[in-house]
Structures are given as C-alpha cells and as structure tokens.
C-alpha cells in the first residue's frame, strides 16, 4: 500500500528516518532492524528496533535514549518542514508514559528521589490519606520532571539529527525510493556516513 501523496511520503520518510537515526547514534538505544513508510494500522510508517540479546532489566540511561528515539520523528518533522503533523501523537504518548513511569514507579528522578509514587498499575500511592496540598505539590513536581525528561530527549534527538543531517537525508531519500529498508540495507546507508551498526559486545547489560 503506497501513501496517498508525495508530500505524505516525504514527511513519513523523514519522520521514520529521525527515529532510526537517533536509535543508531545514541549508545543505549536498541539497534534498528527495519524501517518502512508503508502504512501499518493508523501509523504512516514504522521503525522496528530489537535488542541484540534478551535482558530482564533496563537502566535509566537506556530509558533516556528510548525517549530521545521516540521523539526523533517529531524533531525531524520540525527540522525539515518547520512544522509538525499529527504523526508524532503516538510517539508523544509513548515518551510521556515512559517518563512518568521513570519518575513515579522506578525512582529515576533526581528531583523526586528514589520513591515509588505509583503502583505497577499506575495508581497513585499517596492517595486520599495524604494532605491535598501536599498531594498537589507532588503532582506538580512530577509533571515538571516529566516535562524536563521529555525536553532533554528532544534536545538529545536534535543534537543527533543536526550533527548527522546528511545521513538523515540519505535514509529518508532511500525510504522514498524503496519504501522499506531491512536491517542490512539500512546499515549500508548509515555506514556510508560513518555511523557503525551496533554489535553484541557493544550492547549494554540491562534491558526490559
């Protein structure tokens, strides 16, 4: 199934190229296995990344790179077209949910500290028994931390895409041409721009 317009194809190509390139450059993100601009459900395209080896735990550094990768499409759209579409809406949701879990469930916020403010189901742990004003203060701090984490992810993605603009263009143009890049084809493109694919001994120890 081909996208409806040339503009849609170009926009989706840069969006997915943004995801893929950020994942390939940042050290704690999983390697890219496939990139496509063929529509899949409600998404205009998709980027598939898989860990090299199965792991049961994930580190804060890996979560931070995952958020940057999630925002790579948003950043690419803004950088290339000076605007954003509805395309990154699911990416924003993924990044926000992950950032919030880092803060409230896994104690990964330096500001909030190593406390669990939500259960595994996402329910607040400080509940009705806690003073309302105190509860609102915590909620505000959580929101501020979530925003900061996402903003940091955006800045990280921006740095990658600005420093590797030629690679971004090359990935997007190749996607416009062939629509889908499998792992080997994708890696040939990035290698041409000095970006080395991730190998097993380079991968980090912890991952969910």
What are these regions (language model features)?
Residues 1-3:
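Interdomain coupling/hinge region of P-loop NTPase helicase/AAA+ cores
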Residues 8-14, 20-208:
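Soluble catalytic regions of large protease machineries
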């Amino acid at each position: 199934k081909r996208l409806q317009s040339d503009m849609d194809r170009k926009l989706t190509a840069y969006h997915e190229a943004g995801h893929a390139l950020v994942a390939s450059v940042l050290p704690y993100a999983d390697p890219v296995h496939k990139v496509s601009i063929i529509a899949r459900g409600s998404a205009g395209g998709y980027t598939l990344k898989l860990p090299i080896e199965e792991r049961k735990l994930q580190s804060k550094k890996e979560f931070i790179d995952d958020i940057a990768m999630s925002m790579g499409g948003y950043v690419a759209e803004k950088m290339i077209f000076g605007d954003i579409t509805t395309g990154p809406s699911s990416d924003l949701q993924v990044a926000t949910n992950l950032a919030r879990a880092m803060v409230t469930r896994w104690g990964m916020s330096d500001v909030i500290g190593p406390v669990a403010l939500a259960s595994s189901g996402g329910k607040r742990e400080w509940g009705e028994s806690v003073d309302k004003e105190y509860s609102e203060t915590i909620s505000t701090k959580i929101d501020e931390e979530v925003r900061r984490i996402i903003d940091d992810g955006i800045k990280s993605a921006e740095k990658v895409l600005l420093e590797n603009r030629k690679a971004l263009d090359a990935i997007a143009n190749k996607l416009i041409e062939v629509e889908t890049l499998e792992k080997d084809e994708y890696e040939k493109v990035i290698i041409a721009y000095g970006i080395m694919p991730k190998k097993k001994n380079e991968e980090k120890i912890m991952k969910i």
